[in-house]
Design a protein with these regions (language model features):
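Long, internal low-complexity/basic segments
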Residues: 1-6, 13, 17-18, 43, ...
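C-terminal cap/loop subdomain of S1 sulfatases and analogous C-terminal strand-loop tails that border
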Residues: 122, 127-128, 133-136, 297-307, ...
Length: 487
């Protein structure tokens, strides 16, 4: 094994807010292994994703680009795969951090959910490739698997399968002279129907039989959720997959919420097994372990169930965007950091830890986390977007701006004072005394997207999106009937 460069193990969960992990303060969801990882490393309390949908976030993590730069504004819809080019990789035209690791001598593995195009062949500089052909999880069981050059169906739970395959990969690397990067994007806890509909049947089901769900807010459904559902009905012609009913039905389905909790514990269990494998293989002391999620998930906060696009206009409230982020390993200080962190920071931070060349370019907005100092980070604001909604967040303010154009219904903006209103309940956007603050934040927002967006993918400037958007009729109304998505 190369002692000069550490192995890097990146865990990513699917649809998990920091709120639903033990070490972030949740006393109902049992995650002892993630909690131990945090105890032995650096936990970031203010880490945020770029977009609260699967595919855009995964693309941002790998490339260091915002959705308006890489062009993926929504989850890539599996139902449209027949329209995608052969072997289509949605970020294939961009540089990515695994390719920089490979140039530095790393052996790269992806073991888990990909959701960035056609997955039948390995891409993005991964040598070892075990994934699904699909992005959405309809069930955790009986899934088709792509295992390098083989395909087969696996009967058991997919999280346990990816755990076992990661352990096999580590076993295979014990005597290797080159370091490895292993990306393990689990496809849970997920949170959508039909995968979590009803009582759980996994090994942690009984753990939550009597869970009171006191950490789940009890709020009425937000009107914006109903508006989103109505839009989906209109866009689809009246027929919708069952998963889209979840935001309306989850509030009264305790079995599904307990199911979601159990899937989080199953991921935690897998992480514990993988870390134990590193330990008994004498590899842990030279491995940096990272835990994060693609984006958050709202379990009733503000009356929203799901994530960003569960509401219309989209929600950019904290539960959908605040992600867990934990680093543990050699050279990393133990502690808790309140520094503002974007998932865009992951790419160059990992490359820095590996002493590899950084991602560069006019659209790349990756900074480097100082993992030796819990209070040192050079980002004093961060940016988020969800198609028609864009936001700037700093230590004091969250300002959300909506796309506005003549002929469209005005969707409004939102302003929250985070010092006085952590839960983002009191919208100050109509306050006369806050007009100057809104003006200043709006200017900063515009300047950022002028610099870090790619015109052809900037929806607010008439650009397009790859594969699909959530509300195509909205963008056709904005830019004309000839406006289309692209591949």
């Amino acid at each position: 094994m190369n002692k000069n460069r550490p192995n890097i193990l990146l865990f990513m969960s699917d649809n998990q807010s920091a709120d639903f992990i033990g070490c972030y303060g949740n006393y109902e969801v049992k995650t002892p292994n993630i909690d131990m990882l945090a105890q032995n490393g650096m936990r970031y309390s203010s880490a945020f994703c770029t977009n609260a949908m699967c595919s855009p976030c995964r693309a941002s993590v790998l490339t260091g680009l915002m959705p308006s730069a890489h062009g993926i504004h929504n989850w890539l819809d599996d139902n449209l795969e027949s329209q995608w080019p052969d072997n289509w990789n949605a970020i294939g035209e961009f540089d990515n951090f695994p390719s920089k690791l490979k140039e530095a001598g790393y052996s790269n593995a992806l073991i888990g959910k990909y959701h960035l195009g056609k997955a039948w062949k390995s891409s993005d500089a991964f040598d070892h490739w075990i994934t699904f052909p699909h992005g959405h999880t309809k069930s955790f069981y009986k899934n088709k698997i792509i295992d390098n050059d083989k395909t087969y169906e696996h009967e058991g739970h997919s999280v346990e399968f990816f755990t076992d395959k990661t352990i096999e990969f580590i076993d295979d690397k014990k005597k290797s002279e080159s370091p490895f990067f292993c990306f393990v994007p689990f496809n849970g806890p997920y949170g959508h129907w039909p995968s979590i509909k009803g009582k759980p049947v996994n090994k942690f089901a009984e753990l939550y039989n009597d869970c009171k769900l006191d950490t789940v807010p009890r709020e009425g459904i937000n009107k914006r959720v109903i508006d989103r559902f109505s839009n989906r009905i209109l866009e689809s012609g009246g027929s919708l997959p069952e998963q889209f009913a979840g935001p309306l039905l989850l509030p009264n389905n305790k079995d599904s919420i307990r199911n979601y909790f159990s899937q989080a514990s199953l991921i935690d269990d897998g992480i514990g097994k993988i870390i134990e494998k590193l330990k008994v293989s004498s590899m842990l002391e030279n491995t940096i372990v990272i835990y994060t999620s693609d984006h958050g998930f709202s379990l009733g906060n503000h009356g929203i169930w799901g994530h960003g696009m569960a509401a219309w206009p989209s929600s950019i409230h904290r539960p959908s965007f605040n992600i867990p982020l934990i680093f543990s390993g050699p050279g990393i200080t133990k502690g808790v950091s309140e520094a503002l962190v974007s998932q865009l920071d992951l790419a160059n931070t990992i490359l820095n830890l590996a002493d590899a060349k950084k991602l560069k370019g006019g659209r790349v907005d990756s900074k480097i986390l100082n993992l030796a100092d819990e209070n040192s980070h050079n980002r004093n604001m961060l940016f988020m977007e969800q198609e028609e909604s864009r936001a700037i967040r700093n230590e004091r303010w969250l300002y959300i701006e909506r796309f506005n154009k003549e002929g469209l219904n005005y969707l409004g903006c939102e302003l929250y004072d985070l010092e006085e209103d952590y839960d983002e309940r009191n919208d100050l956007s109509n306050s006369a005394s806050h007009k100057n603050i809104i003006s200043s934040l709006s200017i900063q927002l515009s300047k950022y997207y002028d610099k870090f967006s790619e015109p052809k993918f900037n929806l607010w400037a008439g650009g397009s999106a790859k594969s699909n958007v959530s509300n195509p009729s909205f963008w056709k109304k904005a830019w004309g009937s000839k406006w289309e998505t692209t591949n």
